[in-house]
């Protein structure tokens, strides 16, 4: 009887040990599954941010070339668009895209990310939410200005366009040819601002028109001629004769594409003179929108 009692105790002990082992084994499996899930989340998040970067950096040629010296390292193809677009379709698409990106980002659980990824998450979410708020006022942006306007800044960007080889030169020439299309989107945007009483004041427009007129007058001493000649001189692998040929082509494109694009922009903007209803700046318009009616 005493032996049977001991045997029973041993059985119970073994059963308890077995239960504990099963529990510990199950816990280990659950923990392993959780760890795998966290690792998967981290990997997917890295893939998401990588795709986000590639998509946004390659929306147009001039942006991608400005930020990336070797886009092929990121396996990026040549963008279809030469310049950013300011037309109604692109503005609406951007608004929809921002909302979708926020929803994608929300799917990630921050606690399953590394500290560095959590910081990236917070910065990206803050950026997207700010962009979403700004998208409520798509025509409040001041795209034209005497020095800071896009019609002035694009000259500086083109004059600093990085030239390392013949591929860069040909891409640069395509940008010169496509400047008219870019200005068309600025004209369309300006007309939409007029409809909403958000266009430049007459004084500001006068300054913009003066800046454009100065560009048009520089037919022989245009900055795009001088800067191109300097940049191409430093390129290795192109002989002197070919460089001279490219310099002639650049000067020709400025005369046949760039200056006519500025002349067209001048003409359309001049026709909008007198439509600047708000002399106090866009800030006042925002105040009127944000303040409750009393």
Can you say where each PLM-predicted feature lies in the sequence?
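N-terminal maturation segment of proteins
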Residues: 3-290, 294
């Amino acid at each position: 009887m005493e032996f049977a009692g001991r045997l029973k105790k041993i059985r119970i002990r073994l059963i308890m040990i077995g239960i504990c082992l099963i529990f510990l084994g199950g816990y280990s499996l659950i923990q392993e599954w959780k760890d795998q899930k966290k690792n998967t989340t981290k990997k997917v998040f890295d893939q998401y941010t990588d795709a986000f970067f590639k998509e946004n950096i390659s929306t147009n040629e001039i942006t991608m070339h400005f930020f990336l010296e070797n886009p092929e390292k990121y396996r990026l193809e040549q963008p279809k668009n030469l310049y950013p677009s300011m037309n109604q379709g692109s503005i609406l698409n951007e608004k929809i895209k921002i909302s979708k990106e926020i929803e994608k980002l929300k799917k990630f659980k921050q606690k399953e990310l590394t500290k560095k990824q959590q910081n990236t998450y917070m910065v990206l979410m803050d950026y997207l939410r700010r962009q979403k708020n700004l998208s409520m006022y798509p025509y409040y942006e001041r795209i034209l200005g005497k020095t800071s306007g896009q019609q002035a800044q694009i000259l500086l960007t083109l004059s600093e366009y990085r030239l390392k080889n013949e591929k860069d030169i040909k891409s640069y020439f395509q940008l010169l040819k496509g400047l008219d299309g870019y200005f068309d989107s600025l004209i369309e945007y300006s007309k939409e601002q007029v409809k909403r009483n958000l266009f430049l004041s007459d004084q500001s427009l006068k300054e913009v028109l003066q800046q454009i007129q100065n560009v048009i007058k520089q037919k022989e001493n245009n900055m795009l001629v001088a800067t191109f000649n300097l940049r191409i001189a430093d390129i290795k692998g192109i002989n002197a004769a070919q460089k001279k040929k490219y310099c002639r082509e650049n000067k020709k494109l400025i005369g046949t594409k760039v200056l006519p694009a500025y002349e067209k922009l001048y003409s359309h903007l001049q026709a909008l003179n007198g439509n600047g209803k708000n002399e106090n700046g866009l800030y006042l318009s925002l105040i009127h929108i944000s303040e409750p009616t009393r």
